[in-house]
């Protein structure tokens, strides 16, 4: 790793299709645009796999079981690939907005999480921040509509509850 990259302040910006996420992106652009020394990791949380792709009923014949398991894995991979394709425009728009604010494209990384169990979304965000060595997480409040539908909660609130030793920007 080169010295300049080591000195970069890393920030994890959680994005989705929501207005809250768009506000978070604008907030980061406003505060960090045209400044040096920042690396922004865009993270898109893929929604949970549909129930029918979680498991199958099994089979008594081991060969049939193996075949069903392979078919399930193939269906899961296909669903994930489709979800990633659907998320690309969101990540592209976020990157475009940040570049327009003056942040160099070489300082922006786009990533996906694997399909996240709703109760684990906040943990996934914090784990990704730790893995990317991000000391700050930026998230829009009331983002991730799939999380709210399933849990009647808010990812940002859960991140706030779980976070330790990290800065949080929760954008309304």
Which ranges hold each PLM region?
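Structural beta-alpha unit
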Residues: 6, 85, 93-136
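Glycine-rich, Arg-bearing micro-motifs that act as flexible, cationic patches
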Residues: 6-8, 119-120, 136-161
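A structural signal for isolated positions on well-ordered beta-strands in alpha/beta enzyme cores
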Residues: 10-12, 39-41, 109, 136, ...
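Active-site phosphate/pyrophosphate- and oxyanion-stabilizing loops and adjacent acidic/basic residues
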Residues: 26, 126, 157-158
